[in-house]
Amino acid sequence: MRIELATEPGDPQHPNEDYASVALPASGQGGVLVLLDGVTPPPYEVGCTHPVPWYTARLGGAMLELSGSFRDMTLPEALSAAISRTAEVHRSTCDLSHARTPQATAVAARWSPDTVEYLVLSDSVLLVEHHDGTVRPVLDTRLDELPPAVKALRETVRGLPRGSAERAAAAREYTAAVEALRNAEGGFFTAAADPAVAARAVTGSLPRAEVRSLTALSDGASRWVEVFREGSWADCAAVVHKEGPQGLVDRVRALEAADPDGTAFPRGKSRDDATVVLVAP
């Protein structure tokens, strides 16, 4: 079995908001991977005293334990229970009803001798490589399917000079429009304090015999495909296999450095936390 992971903050001066871990049972039969991408908080009060890395560490740890130790639980059930457990830790001190209480995107996979199960919530990615070499991305595309009016606001922001007052004003309008769709019908979903959100995840299972490898990516790593258009998902998986997870992160960093202002490749952050997990069970 091959297990490798790499994670790197977008800004060395700020904590990494991603979480990644892999657990193997003592029996050696099967395993679990969990990757979370913490949602960077806005620059205003969100009703919680805890930083995003605090949240992702606790949610990720709970998800890893529950999905690995209780194999009778489905992955959505494990995520739901992990969200509930994490919420209880700070319910008495924080306003968990706030729309921007700490939250994260999620990828999880669990394998046994017979089956590979998977879960994806929001814009992190799981790549499933089959033995014939084909690679299938498991994607939750709801964040890409925003209403046309919201997409138009995003393009307006990207078309204005960075640092300008006009861009800042347009960005505030765009952000407000996106926030109105967060964890709402017709919008997109992230793991925050509502355990019911787990049922919104993209899930499925495959025969273990069909799966050669699994690669989980936070969106800071998947931008190699989605933002910089350096290759297909199959190309991305090939880079990870050949150069390791750190190799993909290094490639992304080089692309970001070549376009620091996002002129050629518009994106929300010039650099983002980037995490890659490779498992070849």
Predicted ranges, named:
Residues 1-281:
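PP2C/PPM-type serine/threonine phosphatase catalytic domain
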